[in-house]
């Protein structure tokens, strides 16, 4: 039963500054499910004050771009597990510094890049004519590159899919129905991210709109029109297995599952961006636990026993007082131990702006994929934060 739109589902979002002024305070609750009190931090997880920056040397506009091209926005970046280099994409010179709406379908350039992690030189570049709006990227243990295509073209013949490429750019598999968003089994409606699990199963985070649904009535309307906020699981050969989750605030529900990661224990982490939390599941979709100290997470990366979470969206109206940036902490605790600060931005004087995707190389250097909120301030699609 829905309630009046005047009653928000997340009163704590508007009041998070008051509720979370100390790093050990209780995180926002979700429909009477209280978040556990976080462990005491050495600094402040909200502002980043008093926290170490492990990668203080900033290289803006990192990575080479072919002659004649301008950087477009991005949201995804990953590390090749075979050689340690960097995979990412840019949206065909559009959506940010390049200007214009994102439309890789009608822009004859290759959006997917492999960069040398030391020099930024292009090692591979492909994907022309396959996607409309790339969103998430993942490199599996065999070096295959997976990319989600977030939106459809005008003709309804491309988009709302997940594509698997070989390391040289051969398209090996596509999931979803080309150009047809929906909530049926095996279908996608704005797929955000993709990851391959330890046994080769494929997991897709699907549904982007729900983060703006802040009332029960808005959520109900979204469900009625077929909007999704779920995780879909497929076999290694692409057969649909199951989905779990819907738009909501309870555990196992999401308001925009924006990014995915696996830890060394084989647990699946979901950045539930609209609910300002991380949700952790086993590989069958059973809820295990949550994290609340890492803010409004857009991108995730787990390296060993360390979690890196990047916040690109916290702003005065959706998450007061929380600064954008990269929060770093131990996988097994809800505790932030380090922080990489955001870029300055005039309309977010206190909170700043940071990228959407994050990855970390073998040396501990951190890479950010700059989205529409940050690409102008960053000066390019990718930023490298070096340890030395």
Regions found by a protein language model. Give the residues of each.
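Bacterial N-terminal signal peptides that target proteins for export
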Residues: 2-13
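Residue-level signal for mature regions of secreted extracellular proteins and peptides
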Residues: 17-18
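Eukaryotic scaffold repeat domains enriched in small/polar residues
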Residues: 33-388
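Bacterial signal peptide processing site
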Residues: 25-27
């Amino acid at each position: 039963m829905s309630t009046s739109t005047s009653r928000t589902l997340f009163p704590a979002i508007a009041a998070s500054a008051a509720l979370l002024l100390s790093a050990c305070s209780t995180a926002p609750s979700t429909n009477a499910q209280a978040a556990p009190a976080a462990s005491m931090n050495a600094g402040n997880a909200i502002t980043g004050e008093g926290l170490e920056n492990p990668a203080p040397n900033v290289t803006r506009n990192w990575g080479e771009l072919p002659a004649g091209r301008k950087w477009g926005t991005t949201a995804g970046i990953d590390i090749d597990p075979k050689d340690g280099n960097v995979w990412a994409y840019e949206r065909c010179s559009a959506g940010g510094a390049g200007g214009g709406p994102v439309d890789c379908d009608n822009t004859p350039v290759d959006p997917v890049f492999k960069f040398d992690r030391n020099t930024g030189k292009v090692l591979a570049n492909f994907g022309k004519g396959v996607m409309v709006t790339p969103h998430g990227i993942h490199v599996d243990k065999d070096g295959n590159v997976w990319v989600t295509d977030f939106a459809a073209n005008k003709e309804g013949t491309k988009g709302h899919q997940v594509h698997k490429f070989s390391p040289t750019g051969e398209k090996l598999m596509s999931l979803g129905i080309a150009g047809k968003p929906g909530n049926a089994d095996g279908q996608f409606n704005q797929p955000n991210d993709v990851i391959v699990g330890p046994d080769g199963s494929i997991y897709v985070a699907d549904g982007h709109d729900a983060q703006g649904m802040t009332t029960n009535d808005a959520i109900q309307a979204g469900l009625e029109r077929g909007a999704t906020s779920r995780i879909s699981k497929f076999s290694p050969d692409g057969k649909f297995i199951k989905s779990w989750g819907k738009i909501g605030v309870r555990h196992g529900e999401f308001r925009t599952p924006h990014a995915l990661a696996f830890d060394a224990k084989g647990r699946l982490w979901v950045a539930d961006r609209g609910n300002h939390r991380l949700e952790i599941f086993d590989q069958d979709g059973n809820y295990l636990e949550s994290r609340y100290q890492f803010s409004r997470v857009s991108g995730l990366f787990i390296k060993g026993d360390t979690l890196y979470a990047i916040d690109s969206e916290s702003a005065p109206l959706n998450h007061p007082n929380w600064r954008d940036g990269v929060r770093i902490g131990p996988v097994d605790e809800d505790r932030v131990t380090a922080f990489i600060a955001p870029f300055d931005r005039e309309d977010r004087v206190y909170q700043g702006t940071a990228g959407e995707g994050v990855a970390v190389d073998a040396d501990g250097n951190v890479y950010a994929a700059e989205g529409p909120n940050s690409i102008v301030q960053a000066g390019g699609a990718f930023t490298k934060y070096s340890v030395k």
